[in-house]
Amino acid sequence: MSRKAVVERITKETQIKLSLDIDGAGEAKVCTSVPFLDHMLNLFARHGLFNLEVEAKGDIDIDFHHTVEDIGIVLGEALKQALGDKSGIRRYGQASVPMDETLASVAVDLSGRPYLAYNVRLPKVKIGDFDVELAREFFQALTNNLAANIHINVMYGDNVHHILEACFKALARALDQATQHDPRISGVMSTKGKL
């Protein structure tokens, strides 16, 4: 069974095309015109073992907000499409990732109900020209469009780059876990029979 999706989003603010293979090898080709986001998406693909291609153009002359948020929307939609009815998947995933002085933990439930818990203190407002508050916008958009519970907690950390990198890596690993097929699971992992 192929667990792939291609999603396009065209608005007056952005044009995005994203292709995703959940059962990939961690290969990425990302060009968003937002260098820090490119870096985060590349490592997201690598650590989740997803094949990911993203091509995005946006109104970055204003700021990165629309581009970052819309990529979160499209990635959430692609994950949701690729998972189909979620038959046989584990549903839950959790990962803790250290990066030097930082420790981030992410828990995921592919429940069909969107909720983001974001307990991340960022000691700076920018990494280069990237507004770090946009990370939350990305995670919220992904959460809403994947329709998942995602809890992101940073226990400690001082370097804002390390903090966000650990969050993206932990999310990737938690999603990899949650999306894995388990041969013991018949149908979906719910007593309701539907996710």
From Swiss-Prot:
Keyword list, A-Z: Amino-acid biosynthesis, Cytoplasm, Histidine biosynthesis, Lyase
PROSITE patterns per the UniProt record, alphabetical: IGP_DEHYDRATASE_1, IGP_DEHYDRATASE_2
Pfam families recorded: IGPD
Domain of life: Bacteria
Major subcellular site: cytoplasm
Reactions it catalyzes: D-erythro-1-(imidazol-4-yl)glycerol 3-phosphate = 3-(imidazol-4-yl)-2-oxopropyl phosphate + H2O
EC number: 4.2.1.19
GO cellular component, one term: cytoplasm
Gene3D superfamilies: Imidazole glycerol phosphate dehydratase, domain 1
InterPro entries linked: IGPD_sf (IPR038494), ImidazoleglycerolP_deHydtase (IPR000807), ImidazoleglycerP_deHydtase_CS (IPR020565), Ribosomal_Su5_D2-typ_SF (IPR020568)
CDD domains in UniProt: IGPD
GO molecular function per UniProt: imidazoleglycerol-phosphate dehydratase activity
Subcellular localization: Cytoplasm
Pathway: Amino-acid biosynthesis; L-histidine biosynthesis; L-histidine from 5-phospho-alpha-D-ribose 1-diphosphate: step 6/9
Family: Belongs to the imidazoleglycerol-phosphate dehydratase family.
Protein name: Imidazoleglycerol-phosphate dehydratase
Natural source organism: Geotalea daltonii (strain DSM 22248 / JCM 15807 / FRC-32)
Organism lineage: Bacteria, Pseudomonadati, Thermodesulfobacteriota, Desulfuromonadia, Geobacterales
Gene: hisB
